[in-house]
């Protein structure tokens, strides 16, 4: 959701800045990942949305469920709960992860394929994409049968569409204009 992204951005940046100061970037990433996963579970999500449960109770429950030990991360959860923003934790995690990758000079890439790719194919694609985008890439692969064939690659806001669906869409657009 674009709205969540806008709301989460300053929280992610502030937390990342503090993590840099404390030299805790990677460990806090793990804590945020757990928080984001727990918040998306059905019972926890309904608890967060329940107005009769006060903010400190919600924060305490989340902290206990995840088993957070770090004082600053606990305080972060308490601040989010106090501002009724616990539901943005998955987006905060996603943006914090992007900041971490950027800090380490790594970009995130998603390869969409109509069919499962072998490890060898993913490796070859990774080499080609690393050269093309002149950066080290953290690659994930997702299967999308509607592509019909070929692949589509997303790196940040750049899209490389080499799928049959993309070619057919381009052909249709050309023929109808």
UniProtKB/Swiss-Prot annotation:
UniProt protein name: ATP synthase subunit delta
CC per GO annotation: plasma membrane; proton-transporting ATP synthase complex
Family: Belongs to the ATPase delta chain family.
MF-aspect GO terms: proton-transporting ATP synthase activity, rotational mechanism
Organism, scientific name: Neisseria gonorrhoeae (strain ATCC 700825 / FA 1090)
Pfam families xref list: OSCP
Disulfide bonds: none
Keyword vocabulary terms for this entry: ATP synthesis, Cell inner membrane, Cell membrane, CF(1), Hydrogen ion transport, Ion transport, Membrane, Transport
Function: F(1)F(0) ATP synthase produces ATP from ADP in the presence of a proton or sodium gradient. F-type ATPases consist of two structural domains, F(1) containing the extramembraneous catalytic core and F(0) containing the membrane proton channel, linked together by a central stalk and a peripheral stalk. During catalysis, ATP synthesis in the catalytic domain of F(1) is coupled via a rotary mechanism of the central stalk subunits to proton translocation.
């Amino acid at each position: 959701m674009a709205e969540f992204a806008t709301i989460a951005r300053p929280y992610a940046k502030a937390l990342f800045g503090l993590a840099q100061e404390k030299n805790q970037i990677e460990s806090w990433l793990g804590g945020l990942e757990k928080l984001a996963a727990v918040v998306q579970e059905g019972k926890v999500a309904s608890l967060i949305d329940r107005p009769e449960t006060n903010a400190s109770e919600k924060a305490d429950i989340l902290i206990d469920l995840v088993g957070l030990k770090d004082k600053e991360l606990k305080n972060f959860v308490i601040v989010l709960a106090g501002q009724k923003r616990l539901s943005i934790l998955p987006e905060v995690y996603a943006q914090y992860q992007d900041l971490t990758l950027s800090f380490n000079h790594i970009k995130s890439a998603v390869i969409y394929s109509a069919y499962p790719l072998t490890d060898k194919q993913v490796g070859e694609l990774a080499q080609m994409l690393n050269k093309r985008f002149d950066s080290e890439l953290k690659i994930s692969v997702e299967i999308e049968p509607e592509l019909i064939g070929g692949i589509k690659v997303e790196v940040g806001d750049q899209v490389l569409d080499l799928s049959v669906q993309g070619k057919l869409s381009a052909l249709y657009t050309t023929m109808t204009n």
